[in-house]
């Protein structure tokens, strides 16, 4: 049974309907001080296109939260039930480094002086950032990226993680195209094994290690190698 469907959740689980089609749930296994899961009221597959507008609206209305999307084979814990996540804003290293990253962006497409799509040249994973001043413009720019990405084998959408937050009067949406679910080190043997299956939080620079031994032996070089292995090549 699907653990995000209301009929299968514990009676103690508090919930609130938001945007008329999601339930706001406190994540029972949080990885950040504030961590919500927002499943759709209806059981339906994890797909970004029907949710991107809602994701941007939630980010715009809740500047203290960062919205996350994990594709079906990109860290999603429930790929058969559509959901977003929301966490405390400003905690991910991606966000904390934004002022620096912002100074080395490669233009991909612009709609005016301030809105458009840029490639993040200084980030270790393949990443595109959408800068927009409205949900509608952000959604339109996202769809142009979506259409340009290669479809994944046996899946109905390109592999990706998406991170969105409000930055003053603009919306920032970081799209991280993927080519692989997990790095080879996930199934490696002995000291070569790292049980890291990256989702949006990990791709945003905060690596979650279920095992203490992985935490202790993790290095920047290993993290960079994982990013490069699972990311679509920047080209």
Residue ranges: model-predicted function:
Residues 60-66, 152-157:
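Short secondary-structure junctions
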């Amino acid at each position: 049974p699907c653990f995000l469907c209301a009929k299968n959740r514990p009676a103690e689980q508090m919930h609130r309907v938001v945007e008329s089609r999601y339930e706001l749930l406190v994540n029972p296994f949080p990885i950040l001080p504030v961590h919500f899961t927002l499943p759709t009221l209806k059981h339906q597959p994890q797909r970004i296109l029907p949710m991107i507008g809602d994701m941007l609206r939630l980010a715009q209305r809740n500047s203290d939260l960062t919205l996350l999307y994990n594709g079906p084979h990109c860290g999603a814990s429930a790929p058969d039930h559509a959901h977003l996540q929301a966490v405390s804003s400003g905690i991910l290293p991606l966000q904390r480094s934004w002022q620096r990253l912002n100074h080395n962006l490669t233009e991909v497409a612009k709609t005016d002086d301030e809105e458009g799509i840029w490639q993040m040249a200084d980030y270790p994973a393949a990443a595109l950032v959408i800068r927009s001043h409205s949900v509608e413009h952000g959604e339109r720019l996202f769809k142009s990226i979506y259409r340009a990405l290669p479809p994944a084998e046996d899946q109905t959408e390109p592999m990706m993680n998406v991170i969105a937050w409000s930055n003053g009067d603009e919306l920032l949406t970081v799209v991280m195209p993927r080519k692989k679910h997990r790095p080879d080190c996930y199934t490696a043997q002995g000291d070569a094994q790292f049980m890291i299956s990256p989702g949006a939080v990990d791709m945003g620079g905060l690596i979650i290690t279920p095992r203490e031994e992985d935490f202790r032996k993790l290095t920047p070089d290993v993290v960079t190698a994982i990013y490069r292995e699972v990311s679509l090549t920047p080209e």
